[in-house]
Regions:
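Sec-dependent signal peptide recognition
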Residues: 1-4
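C-terminal motif of bacterial Sec signal peptides marking the signal peptidase cleavage site
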Residues: 8-11
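Acidic, small-residue rich beta-repeat scaffolds with periodic aromatic anchors
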Residues: 14-35, 39-64, 154-263
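Blade-edge motifs of beta-propeller repeat domains
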Residues: 47-87, 129-141
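Beta-propeller blade termini
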Residues: 89-98, 140-150
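Acidic/hydrophobic-patterned starts of short beta strands in beta-sheet-rich repeat architectures
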Residues: 100-110, 147-155
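Short glycine/acidic-enriched loop and turn motifs that connect beta-strands
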Residues: 112-115, 158-160
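Beta-propeller blade repeat segments, especially FG-GAP/WD-type strand-to-loop junctions
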Residues: 117-135, 170-173
Length: 263
């Protein structure tokens, strides 16, 4: 199961990313763009052969969500609470091969609720139990890529300011059939503070060689490193080049849509 980086930032009791090293206090912002040469179209998720055993398991899981307002395989998570006048039927699910392993997965997203209840879960089929197992458990701000997830933080209350919204990267591990934490990305604007009292670290002027007034923080395996803008843009291009977001076929969690999975 995906250990959701510290990205969980209290959301959905996740553990999808390494824990941020700075307390977060400021509002959202735009991300520094990387130059692109074309406006590519979004790839579709793959269409594997239909597995009715898997679909039946997904159908049962969705009925647990719809009828019991509970997350399958998360017995201690409590009830799903949806803010009125909305209902669970306003929330979303999809059945598609999102991880590229040739088998369908079940994605369930609940967002019309309190912050810590907002989450997206990717379930895979477990033929040993004829049930479902969790491949990824994260906050709702997920962009799906082939073999990769980009998960936005639930809050931007650190020192990133208007440089970027913090996010985590997780990669699909075929051997484990689940997503694994890789990176947590944040930023530090010198105008907000030139000293991080939490880590007792002064602003790294030696890293900010372009005198941009901000640096990026990449956390990997619990270790944090600083990057200036030029180095970050190269690093970011290495992560996202030739990867386009997948189009996920979301639909509402209605009785009719659940029943239509297997007839």
């Amino acid at each position: 199961m995906l250990a959701v980086l510290l990205l969980l930032l209290s959301a959905c009791s996740r553990t999808t990313a390494p824990k941020p090293t700075m307390a977060q206090y400021f509002a959202p912002s735009k991300r520094i763009p990387v130059e692109t040469t074309a406006e590519p179209t979004q790839p579709e998720t793959t269409v594997p052969d239909r597995n009715d055993a898997a679909r039946s398991a997904f159908q049962r899981a969705l009925r647990t969500v719809h009828d019991d307002l509970r997350w399958p395989e998360l017995p201690d998570s409590g009830n799903i609470e949806v803010w009125e006048p909305g209902t669970i039927e306003d929330e979303q699910f999809a059945v598609t091969d999102v991880d590229g392993d040739g088998e369908e997965e079940l994605l369930v997203s609940v967002s019309n609720t309190y912050m810590v209840g907002m989450c997206e879960i990717i379930y895979g089929y477990d033929p040993q139990t004829d049930g479902v197992r969790i491949e990824s458990h994260s906050y709702v701000g997920v962009t799906h890529y082939p073999g990769m997830l980009k998960v936005e933080a639930s809050h931007n209350q650190g020192y990133a300011g208007d440089v970027l919204w913090p996010y985590a990267i997780a990669y699909y591990d075929e051997a484990e059939d689940s997503y694994k934490d890789a990176f947590y990305v944040d930023a530090w604007c010198k105008d907000i503070t030139d000293y991080d009292s939490y880590t007792e670290t002064p602003y790294p002027d030696d890293i900010d060689t372009g005198h941009d007034g901000y640096v990026y923080l990449i956390t990997e395996n619990g270790e944090r490193r600083f990057m200036n803008r030029a180095d970050y843009e190269k690093w970011e291009a290495g992560i996202f080049t030739n990867k386009e977001p997948l189009t996920v076929p979301w639909q509402k969690i209605t009785t009719a849509n659940i029943d239509a999975l297997v007839k």
